[in-house]
From Swiss-Prot:
GO terms for molecular function: urate oxidase activity. Keywords: Nodulation, Oxidoreductase, Peroxisome, Purine metabolism. It is found in: Peroxisome. Transmembrane segments: none annotated. PANTHER family: URICASE (PTHR42874:SF1). This is Uricase-2 isozyme 1. InterPro entries: Uricase (IPR002042), Uricase_CS (IPR019842). Homotetramer. It comes from Glycine max. The keyword Oxidoreductase applies. Urate binds at residues 64-65, 166, 183, 238-239, 265. The active site is at residues 18, 64, 267. The keyword Nuclease does not apply.
Length: 309
């Protein structure tokens, strides 16, 4: 998105913004139920302010403190509950429409996973606890109204105690890992998916559409990893499982054009301990040493043939 310019005989690109703007917004219904979101917002603006770099002329700059204030002002204006995606688009649209010199904006948001608590089997009106995985989004908006919207998950920790193996890989003089058709598999999923909407005018109008989609994608990813509740599904490698998770996402959601997954292979090492008198701990698929350093790193992306990505 950045426009390259030639200044004083050099190629020059620039952008500026504000990072780690933390905002929480509470909505209260007439029935007494409260809703809360907590977001960490990052803003990047592309604008015609080259004079601020070349000379003492700041007249074209949107101050980063102004960007910060705008986050709180726009949060205040949102009288209805909205998704992180909707707020990111709202902010980006504001910056490109409100400021003549701004040609494009990137707004990224990480949502802290506050979840409503249940007390005595009933959802609490205003009580929340912190969950684990985080909802992320990035909206890229240009003055023309073009849009690129990406959502994601960070820190989705999943584990299977069986139904995983790894055999017939390349062996050489450096290989010590034995073949196995029975192992534990664990990972912390980082997922990104890009929607096919290419303009501000083509977005779904259903309230909280993207929040629902986030929950649905998370379920598809987890269900594909685990398999059916009775018996599960065998994983011959993290690579194969990753591909099946990405494919299931594209097959399930026609308005998603691209999926990227990163699945670190978090190891559970079988424990065998012996001394001169014999075994102290004999491994029988029961006692493990959990470790995430070092760990395998498996990542891939999948997109539709017509996708521009």
């Amino acid at each position: 998105m950045a426009q390259q310019e030639v200044v004083e005989g050099f190629k020059f690109e620039q952008r500026h913004g504000k990072e780690r703007v933390r905002v929480a917004r509470v909505w209260k219904t007439r029935q007494g139920q409260h809703f809360i979101v907590e977001w960490r917002v990052g803003i990047t603006l592309f604008s015609d302010c080259v004079n601020s770099y070349l000379r003492d002329d700041n007249s074209d700059i949107v101050a980063t403190d102004t960007m910060k204030n705008t986050v709180y002002a726009k949060a205040k204006e949102c009288s209805d509950i909205l998704s992180a995606e909707e707020f990111a688009i709202l902010l980006a649209k504001h910056f490109v429409s409100f400021y003549q010199k701004v040609t494009g904006a990137i707004v990224n948001i990480v949502e802290k996973p506050w979840e409503r608590v249940t007390v005595d089997g009933q959802p609490h009106e205003h009580g929340f606890k912190l969950g684990s995985e985080k909802h992320t989004t990035e909206a890229i908006v240009q003055k023309s109204g073009s849009l690129q919207l990406t959502s994601g998950i960070e820190g989705l920790s999943v584990l299977k105690t069986t139904q995983s193996g790894f055999v017939n890989f390349i062996r050489d003089k450096y290989t010590a890992l034995p073949d196995t058709r029975e192992r534990m598999v664990a990972t912390e999923v980082t997922a990104l998916w890009r929607y096919s909407y290419e303009s501000l005018y083509s977005l779904p109008q259903k309230p909280l559409y993207f929040t629902e989609k986030y929950q649905e994608v998370k379920k598809v990813l987890a269900d594909t990893f685990f398999g059916p509740p009775k018996g599960g599904v065998y994983s011959p490698s993290v690579q194969n499982t990753l591909y099946l998770m990405a494919k299931a996402t594209l097959n399930r959601f026609p308005d998603i054009a691209y999926v990227s997954l990163k699945l670190p292979n978090l190891h559970f090492i079988p424990v065998n301990i012996s001394n001169q008198d014999g075994p102290i701990v004999k491994f029988e698929d029961d006692v493990y040493l959990p470790t995430d350093e070092p760990h395998g790193s498996i990542q891939a992306s999948l997109s539709r043939l017509w996708s521009k990505l």
